[in-house]
A protein has these predicted regions:
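A structural signal for well-ordered alpha-helical scaffolds and beta->alpha junctions
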Residues: 18-22, 119-123, 143-146
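Phosphate/oxyanion-binding loops and surfaces in catalytic or ligand/nucleic-acid-binding neighborhoods
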Residues: 28-31, 85-86, 153-156, 160
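Predominantly a Rossmann-like dinucleotide-binding segment in NAD(P)-dependent oxidoreductases
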Residues: 1-36
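NAD(P)-dinucleotide binding in Rossmann-like oxidoreductases
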Residues: 40-48, 57-128, 134-141
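Preference for short coil/turn "hinge" residues that link or interrupt alpha-helices
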Residues: 2, 8-10, 112, 128-131
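Short, mixed-charge aromatic SLiMs
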Residues: 46-50, 148-151
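C-terminal helix-rich "cap/oligomerization" subdomain common to oxidoreductases
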Residues: 58, 125-166
Length: 166
């Protein structure tokens, strides 16, 4: 059976790709979103095959997330700000971003690192945290927020993994 949809292996869009989408949303929000609504489609195994999620926090900051295990869509993060927007292609393994000035249309491209080395960067950060004990760069509170959001969504969908207790 395909691991992507295997409920015994925590399969589905939320834990496979949604964690990345919700993580970047949380990193750009000044506080955790509290108003969360969604629609989802179950796969034949009961895992989440597709979902759309709307999030809003107390400061009025909002985000939209679209997840799909089947449709071909770009892995793109688009961050809309007051005076510009930021586009990150191939997120979370991006090596560049484009900032577009909303008034002038001027595009500024920023490049850093290598897509091929992206997982290595994550490992370096984790190794550094373990060796030094300094976890400040890991943003653990954001990770906890993302886990809480994902669990809240799965509860709303009544999508529980085998052996899981709420």
């Amino acid at each position: 059976e395909n691991r992507f949809f295997n409920m015994h292996l925590a399969g589905g869009a939320m834990l496979d790709i949604g964690v990345y989408a919700l993580s970047i949303v949380r990193s750009f929000m000044d506080e955790k979103p509290e108003d969360i609504v969604s629609q989802w489609q179950a796969s034949p195994t009961g895992s989440d095959e597709m979902a759309t999620i709307l999030l809003k926090n107390g400061l009025g900051q909002m985000a939209t997330v679209a997840l799909s295990m089947h449709s071909k869509q770009p892995k793109r993060a688009m961050i809309s700000c007051e005076k510009a927007y930021i586009e990150i292609m191939e997120y979370p393994r991006a090596d560049k971003a484009v900032i577009v000035d909303a008034e002038t249309g001027v595009r500024t491209e920023i490049e850093a690192g290598s897509t091929a080395e992206a997982l290595g960067y994550e490992l370096q950060d984790m190794e550094q945290a373990v060796v030094t004990g300094d976890v400040s760069g890991l943003k653990l509170s954001y990770s906890a927020d993302v886990m809480e959001i994902m669990t809240r969504l799965r509860k709303a969908w009544n999508m529980k993994y085998p052996g899981e207790q709420w």
